[in-house]
Amino acid sequence: WDHLGTDARLDGDPVYNGAIDNATGVAGIIEIAEAFAHQATPPQRSVVFAAVTLEESGLLGSQYLVEHSPWALERIAANINLDALPMHGPSRNVTALGYGQSTLDDDLTEAAKTQGRIVVADDEPEKGFFFRSDHANFARAGIPALYASSGQDLVEGGLAAGRKAADDYTANRYHKPSDNYDPDWDYRGVIADLELLYTVGRTLADESRFPQWKPGADFSRPAPGAK
């Protein structure tokens, strides 16, 4: 859960509703959990869905979960993160933050192919987005983590339209009371993203392998007994 609260210093609406950041991410977690629950055959692995708090205060909720994990860290196969799902329609690409660090990117690429999409790296790594959401605490603990969502190459309008939509959100709604629900949202891209991440998660949940960090990655899997 991600909420900035209220700001009495503001004129007019003082409430940061956080409709996109991050009510959409929480709704996405619930949707994927429901999809797992309704499958006729349960997954081979346990799948945990966690909505943590205080992301905007320094990723404190996910930090607490990792530091007080009910499970030994080396037994956690992977982390898949959802945060602020884009609402500007379907895209031809998927942006993976920290692309190339772990074999989860290979799983993502294979799943994206079934949707006719390609996976690309974040084109602004200097902004440190990989370390600004809750998956970062799992990565620091050595657990391969995936954070991916629709890229900016939109089916309708291409890169120009995607960048315009992203810039408009950042300038006018990101971390502002104006981040409200909009009845004109285009859910097609979000649905594609949730189906994609479900596929990656379900594939991992039905296998015994553990995703690994690639050579040269900034992290390594936790040693037995690590907390």
Set out the residue ranges of the language-model regions.
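Catalytic-core environment of secreted peptidases
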Residues: 1-50
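Second-shell loop/turn segments in exported
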Residues: 10-22, 51, 91-99, 122-128, ...
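Soluble non-cytosolic domains of exported or imported proteins
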Residues: 19-27, 56-60, 98-102, 129-132, ...
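Sec-exported extracytoplasmic/periplasmic mature domains
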Residues: 31-41, 67-71, 109, 113-117, ...
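His/Asp/Glu-rich mid-to-C-terminal helical/loop segments that flank catalytic regions of hydrolases
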Residues: 34, 38, 155-222
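Beta-strand segments within the central parallel beta-sheet cores of soluble alpha/beta enzyme folds
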Residues: 44-53, 78-81, 214-216
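Metal-dependent peptidase/peptidase-like ectodomains
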Residues: 52-170
